[in-house]
Design a protein with these regions (language model features):
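Structural motif
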Residues: 37-39, 65, 159-163, 186
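N-terminal nucleotide/polyanion-binding subdomain common to many enzyme families
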Residues: 1-87
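Short amphipathic alpha-helical segments
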Residues: 50-51, 77, 120-121, 172-175, ...
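Internal alpha/beta domain cores that form substrate/cofactor-binding pockets in large enzymes
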Residues: 107-111, 115-124, 130-155, 164-195, ...
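Short, Lys/Arg-enriched, disordered terminal segments
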Residues: 1-9, 101, 239-243
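A transmembrane-helix-recognition feature enriched in membrane-embedded lipid enzymes
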Residues: 70-75, 201-243
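Portal/gating segments that form or line small-molecule/metal binding sites
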Residues: 57-122, 126
């Protein structure tokens, strides 16, 4: 089944089964110019409804994969095709495995120096067929960005992981797309932290139940206020259903 893009409350979301993911990745590798894969939570979803740089970058992404269960529930509630939910870490590992099986290349961008080195070391031991062609720390000075872009462009990787310490997040690759001739760009904030074992990944059972947000609230209690955009999402769904 081909990947289908639906519009939920005006926000694009892709319906991409786990079986179709490999074919889609291969298509992006063959595509002329850079590509972008984005994971979105329900709070990302609500931001995309606004007019801003972040929304623009996601709306133009080549593959938009939902993380939050509530996005799937919303699609079902409005009688639309229901997307497949992705655990970002599992999806990231699957993408790396696809690249490794075809001896493709990879560039790591983000994280602190120590964590980045540990992440690269662990990846080299796990994905032996994957060519890691470069790495660059996040939290960099603005004047260093052009050199970073040139380094990535010169390495010409099949996949660029954009991780923590990149202020523009998904918008970084979109805003610089004219400076790259190829490659898939994927923003996943926690990737370097998990790969370096500095951050513990969400328990798969907790993720399956859709309870991963509670871990985020424990780490940052202010995230409890995310309940308000979620309630607005529910109101919008009901309004759209009725009217």
């Amino acid at each position: 089944m081909a990947v289908q893009r639906i519009k939920l409350l005006g926000v694009p979301v892709d319906v991409c089964s786990k079986q179709d993911l490999e074919e889609k990745i291969l298509q992006l590798l063959e595509k002329k110019g850079p590509s972008q894969i984005s994971f979105i939570t329900i709070w990302d979803f609500m931001k995309i409804r606004c007019k801003n740089e972040y929304a623009e970058s996601i709306r133009n992404a080549d593959l938009i994969l939902p993380i939050s269960k509530s996005i799937l529930s919303g699609a079902k509630f409005l009688n639309k095709s229901v997307p497949f939910r992705y655990n970002p870490f599992d999806a990231f590992i699957s993408i790396l495995s696809i690249l490794e099986s075809r001896y493709k290349s990879f560039y790591i961008f983000g994280g602190r120096k120590k964590a980045l080195a540990a992440a690269e070391k662990n990846m080299r031991s796990t994905f032996r067929g994957l060519q890691i062609v470069g790495r660059c720390v996040g939290y960099y000075q603005k004047q260093d960005e052009e050199n970073i872009i040139q380094a990535i462009s010169k390495a010409s990787p099949s996949l660029v992981l954009v991780s923590e310490g990149i202020k523009k997040k998904d918008f970084w690759s979109y805003s610089n797309k004219e400076k790259f001739s190829s490659g898939i760009f994927l923003y996943y904030r926690d990737a370097v932290g998990i790969l370096s074992k500095r951050i513990k990944r969400v328990n798969p059972k907790v993720f399956e139940k859709g309870h991963e947000v509670w871990g985020e609230i424990i780490r940052n209690p202010l995230r409890i206020f995310l309940i308000f955009p979620f309630l607005w999402y529910i109101i919008l769904l009901v309004w759209t259903k009725l009217f």
